[in-house]
């Protein structure tokens, strides 16, 4: 497992604004995960859930929903950072989120061919 950067206080975390954290461990985004997310959100667009049609589409395979990719952030955070003396964290929100490249579902692909993600994070001020 990736080793998180340990901050001794929220102030120390704030002083790290602009620094890169990570990378995390690799995470496979497979078709089963994509299908479960589609069922949970009701977003069954063919680029996500129809492998046959998606094979002839612009990405050559199905792709993960952008919001699926975003929803994985809580699972990566403990791999990237920990702040001592903090009992819990909450999602305050996100600004200027973009999805510049798709997360492809491609069984048997080795990282980083598209079915895997290994995030890095950059601390920013609010």
Q: What are these model-predicted stretches?
A:
Residues 55-61, 71-117:
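Hydrophobic beta-strand-centered segment that forms part of the acyl-chain substrate-binding groove
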